[in-house]
């Protein structure tokens, strides 16, 4: 055995014995000073071999001995805090990995609040704030040859990353703020940067090193859900350091390459979220997606196809990263193909939420913006096939946003694969989502860090607007200036007062018909367009003024209006036709409702006419369920769907007559003498009137349920006509709600729940929304006692289905409607229990 090594062992053993037994301050300080020589930084250093043996073999034992002696009395043996400072220096100046593990071991083994526990926690706080964690990671980056080194590193890794949880469990309410996760992980990110700077210095000096431990620290932190805290500090500094240094770029590439496979997704997601631009992401990741299969799967599939919660700038940064290098651009083309394949899948359209479809559409548009003309021409046929399939299944959707997505993406794709041909144009609402999607189709200018030319910029999609050139519009509004003294100035009429023509009315040769039969004749046989238009515009008011005459020809008039086509350009033709049809239905509800419901399942009707029937039934039912003073507004049009009964509108014609002067004086005097502590909005009570819809609700409701499962030659509710089925479910829900507290509400509710149960697993989102609304309507309209007495089995079945929808449905609106229905069920149960409980 080497005598020098044996001497170190003997010295350490003797020192531990003295520290354990002696109470003499001078003796203790002398012993600690002797041991401090092995850590360096003294005037009398030891041999390098002795220093290495002490650090690798004996240092942990010395630290444990120092921890065991920690007490207020032991530290006060030396006045002035000299012993305490010397005691702390062993933890702060020695090998950081062993000091850190001994500190963590001591804190975890100390039970309950105590002086030793808080002193060790404060020392650990000092250890962190003085940069010792960076020194710890720097030490792990050096080459290691010990057999036990992997196990030691694993222990060290778990303690470094799990420090906030471990300290929180040990200190509980006495925990220090530095150990909170929101404070610790940004500090750890700063320490990672310092460790990487040391690695760069090693490489510049020609020394060998590894960033594997730092990669594992980063991966474990991201797996535990703290990637935002650590990367918010790490990424901005690496962005600056890698801007002008290829060595720093290589270190960053190596850092992410050595992240364990189980942590690749978390690290990549965090980096993509934190990187401000594609060039920054390219400097941090390099060609990782080309070398690493797991990284390629995460970037090209998981972040784009399986997840959809990421922001639009993140998608742009991710796809821009793929477009910046020639080795990665084939992956961009592959991503576009896979996105379009998913976008064109009818099953995906039915079973994925709208948010995910919008996310995929944005990714497609960003891909198209990054690809050049030659690259797109190579895959032109595949793009065209996917586009046609996607447009077809989206235009068949019942949801307007889904249809709009199909139109916009199809316009952009067609403009890119056929730039020389006629542009494909659709008519859709110009809302915020449409503008955002069209903006994504135009690529941003390539940055200076782009390593590959992106080819010719794609032509922006032609978004036709009413005003093409603002300058031309200005020119058309402002007359051209004329030189002074011109003839136009002499002939000007500006000094004359303009004639008021605001009250002028258009003179018509045909007068408005005065009788219902004249209107029917004019609408069916008249060739005079002015008379036809006048009949249509005056029909609604005439129906309300002549109810008896209307009932004589109500069915005939409803038939004429249902089949009426626009012969000439009439403003608001559809609204006028619908208002007149609603007025006829309100005037003679039983006969007209029988006719309309029988025609809903009839042959040779368009989908538009069938949906018109449903709209008219709902509007008429809404009008019948209101007081007459609200529904008979012959001069102001029919009731608008969704309009609530307002007390101000319920005042009758007689109630609106001006009061006499003496009554006004008396009321004013009373009002001035009255002291009021609070005053609400003035309201007039509505006079009680019967609900006219209650007697005819069955004629509106039950015929619509009879043949929904019987396909016709041109009409199949359970097949392709899902839009009409969705409108039918919403119509039935509205009729059920308007039949509240009526005698027919119970059989209506039972029939509606059976209808819902038959269609509860329908794939169309719009249909499921209507079914869920129908359940809520039943719960609101049928009395509680009748619900639980007549429909207990149906409610139990509906409850289990609602719970399943609230948890698993892909559509957010469906989940929300299911939760509301469940809350209504709970409220009904609580109401029943409170009413059945004995009163004290």
From Swiss-Prot:
Residues with Phosphoserine modification: 457, 486, 488, 492, 837
GO cellular component: chromosome, telomeric region; cytoplasm; cytosol; membrane; nuclear body; TTT Hsp90 cochaperone complex
The name this protein goes by in its record: Telomere length regulation protein TEL2 homolog
Subunit composition and interactions: Component of the TTT complex composed of TELO2, TTI1 and TTI2. Interacts with ATM, ATR, MTOR, PRKDC, RUVBL2, TTI1, TTI2, SMG1 and TRRAP. Component of the mTORC1 and mTORC2 complexes. Interacts (phosphorylated form) with PIH1D1. Interaction with PIH1D1 mediates interaction of TELO2 with the R2TP complex composed of RUVBL1, RUVBL2, PIH1D1, and RPAP3.
Its biological purpose: Regulator of the DNA damage response (DDR). Part of the TTT complex that is required to stabilize protein levels of the phosphatidylinositol 3-kinase-related protein kinase (PIKK) family proteins. The TTT complex is involved in the cellular resistance to DNA damage stresses, like ionizing radiation (IR), ultraviolet (UV) and mitomycin C (MMC). Together with the TTT complex and HSP90 may participate in the proper folding of newly synthesized PIKKs.
Biased composition (Acidic residues): 488-497
Hydroxyproline sites (modified residues): 374, 419, 422
Keywords: Acetylation, Chromosome, Cytoplasm, Hydroxylation, Membrane, Nucleus, Phosphoprotein, Telomere, Ubl conjugation
Source organism of the structure: Mus musculus (Mouse)
GO molecular function, one term: Hsp90 protein binding
